Amino acid sequence: MPNAYKRVLLKLSGEALMGDDAFGINRATIERMVADIAEVVRLGTQLAVVIGGGNIFRGVAGGAAGMDRATADYMGMLATMMNALALQDAMRHAGIEARVQSALRMDQVVEPYIRPRAIRQLEEGKVVIFAAGTGNPFFTTDTAAALRGSEVGAEVVLKATKVDGVYSADPKKDPSATRYSSISFDEAIGRNLQVMDATAFALCRDQKLPIRVFSINKPGALKRIVQGEDEGTLVHV
């Protein structure tokens, strides 16, 4: 079966790396994620990753109360760097070649973000992990995913979450909530569905870059999406 996508951008939240822990990085969880990523890479799909940092520090969280927002956001960017290095290390152990490119320079540890280099590495079959968000405060890693996905020519942004798609309401609070198989950007905005933050959402819509929302906890979901199966919710123009 030919793959439905040649190049994808996977958005992983920092919280997804915690597993059942209260904070930090759960090694078993990250190894399971890497096993799913390895399957996709071996199918021949080029894969880039944007990683969040909420498992370590979040600029808008309670721990940042009273702190200058820009300072808190820069701390969050450093948290994404830790997650990116952990992800790269787990990939190396799984036999996957991965590169970390950061929007903030830390040359002894990771490469700086250079778009042509990132594209070349993807074409060579390497996984490229984008760290430090956009490199600017006041922008989320969701926005970084929309930006990097647009820059490297990804065909879709795959947003891995704790639920298996976009629902009409919070399924944890409303048992009657229904999951959308697909929904347009305009409809999602009109219904105030929290797929991504507004800036990220608007960028994807303007660039006609679809978003596929799926559960990171569902085994094989990433592979099924790449092979064209109807997994989670597709948000489209």
Swiss-Prot record:
Name this protein carries in UniProt: Uridylate kinase
Superkingdom classification of source: Bacteria
Disulphides: none
Principal location listed in the UniProt entry: cytoplasm
Residues the entry annotates as binding UMP: 53, 73, 134-141
Provenance organism: Burkholderia mallei (strain ATCC 23344)
Residues passing through the membrane, by range: none
Subunit record text: Homohexamer.
